[in-house]
């Protein structure tokens, strides 16, 4: 059996404080050990990114509910590129927002669909999974995997979802 090394948040309590979350959906550990938490799985979540030091001590947070740069509606996925930029899959806003590690907004990309998952490989190839686009939720987009450059945002390939009923929403 494994051993719990660290716990963030308070067991059995939800909230929007430094030591509470409301529906966290993703965690990323940076190369230096800092920990980023995407807190806000749906409309009732906190819609924020919370940053902790490697020892679990609170450092900062940013976000809030909305569609302006730096705000979120369901921050659902996190990834980091070789330059240390933090990519946030802002799913309900159908975009990826990019930040420095202090929370400064650097860019917003809307060409990767409605991102549910993000992965950036060592060559800065970005893989963004869209499991929710369909006629009702995100017209004009298709569920699948968007593949592109984490440096430029250029989408170079798309792998469609093999499910034949594109109007049946995923998770």
Please report, for each region that a protein language model flagged, where it lies by residue.
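Eukaryotic scaffold repeat domains enriched in small/polar residues
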Residues: 1-171
